[in-house]
């Protein structure tokens, strides 16, 4: 099997499974739908691992070829092709590996769904195909199609329960916010096509960069901007939407309206990292603009800290993990801004495993609670759900950066990258990610203690009903006990827990201090020496652990855990008093900094008001009443006046004829004698 065939199989097998489950779901049934999609993703996962191993042992070389030319227009060729290198191979394993776990988990989670079971499996396999096409693309046009495809499938999955108004509102919100980002992304691609040699293939664009290094573009009369900087910022606007960076982050928490498995696959491990992957892939361009890198770093720092604050007050178990995702995406963006692209991609990988684990463990707890998602109704689930308890503990320990867990190596590396960066804004970024360590540890273990320790709070509640999942699910009754989830749910948790512990230790040497990303990621060491300083300071996993003992990071994390234990185990009455004491801050957090209100009342209503104005003035007054109906009224008015000449008397008509003859004679003589 040649390389082209291998990569086509990896990309297309999930698509085939999606089409079979979607088009023939009623004929093959529920078992047939999940079997064919799981087999398809499993084939892709195994072959992706084979490809990655080939790069690790040195038997596989970088692949960059076109499959076919899709469109030729005006001397421009738009092709479909594959670029497979170490970064692509790593992402292929992450996407297909997490997707396989989610497919298996979904069998148990969606077991009670009466309708839409086959449709759901079709969607998640279609998403896997779309994400693979995005990361394997070798040109901007294919990247954009993959970019839009994952957005479309995300829209379909967030609104999976389309009879629920909150779900349809959430998927529309996600769709519109991402269109804002995609508009900037498309403008950036347009600049690449117009000024970077007339090609959209990555290798051609990178080769042309020296020709536009000092080029400027006039956005406003008399104001010259660096072409590279403008292009970088516009491309990053797309990343802000897709990777949920402030202020385009508002769609992600609401995306929790979709079933839990897609939260793990799309909104934690894969789609939301697409923007980060794109920036890393474009490192040769971004390295030419320190201004763009500073902007990226500051936006990432704002997202990391201020989204973490919002996670502190959430009571929905899934929304805690959602805001955790936002904060961690901010961490990765800080690394990109510090030119530590390899560190960002390292955290993309480790985060994919432990965050997917946290989402799926949250879903398991929801199953045990009969689909009640409110943590205030839980407590002491450790007694009833030991596997879920242990795996969520592992996920949270990795999230907060506990030494020897995967998240420790990547997260601490990001903090060190911000520390060593010399770009404007790096001081604020370092403070933000450092403060976020405490915040992350606090909200992660607040969730953990509320769910798995303390009193069994559902026993003191009136009989309640929750619409947290499906259409007809109820929470636990007073005398009911939670139950551990079936093996089809807990097995993916166990399998994800393993890389959440060990993958960081295994991968840190080659990915950060070795040649794993050689010739894939470009860093201008003279202008942005961060990663090179880190290579001199640290020499692997054990060096990072040793350093942590002398760093404030570890002690901030411990302080966060102890604070959560004190407030939610020892003194559970205290959080309500603190919230009342700091009521203005609590209200600010509760209203998510009023950004939703701003977007709805200013932009959404403003757009509707502007549209109403143009409709009333332009469409109704000018076009309808003026041009269309107005012309008819004018003809009618003229006809009414002409009609008065129709008297019915012969002498009137004779006089008109004489008058006409005189006019004609006058015109004739005027022409002859003038």
From Swiss-Prot:
Catalysed reactions listed for this entry: a quinone + NADH + 5 H(+)(in) = a quinol + NAD(+) + 4 H(+)(out)
Keyword Translocase part of the UniProt annotation: yes
GO biological process: one example: ATP synthesis coupled electron transport
Position of the signal peptide: none
Keywords linked to the UniProt accession: Cell membrane, Membrane, NAD, Quinone, Translocase, Transmembrane, Transmembrane helix, Ubiquinone
GO molecular function: NADH dehydrogenase (ubiquinone) activity; quinone binding
Coiled coil segments of this chain: none
Subcellular location: Cell membrane
Class of enzymatic activity (EC top level): translocase
Membrane topology: Multi-pass membrane protein
InterPro entries named among the record's database cross-references: NADHpl_OxRdtase_5_subgr, ND/Mrp_TM, NU5C-like, Proton_antipo_N
A Pfam family that the UniProt record links to this protein: Proton_antipo_N
Principal location: membrane
Chain ranges passing through the membrane: 4-24, 36-56, 67-87, 90-110, 115-135, 140-160, 180-200, 219-239, 259-279, 293-313, 348-368, 385-405, 425-445, 488-508, 549-569, 653-673
Enzyme Commission number: 7.1.1.-
GO cellular component: plasma membrane
Protein role: NDH-1 shuttles electrons from NADH, via FMN and iron-sulfur (Fe-S) centers, to quinones in the respiratory chain. The immediate electron acceptor for the enzyme in this species is believed to be ubiquinone. Couples the redox reaction to proton translocation (for every two electrons transferred, four hydrogen ions are translocated across the cytoplasmic membrane), and thus conserves the redox energy in a proton gradient.
Family named by the database record: Belongs to the complex I subunit 5 family.
UniProt-recorded name of the protein: NADH-quinone oxidoreductase subunit L
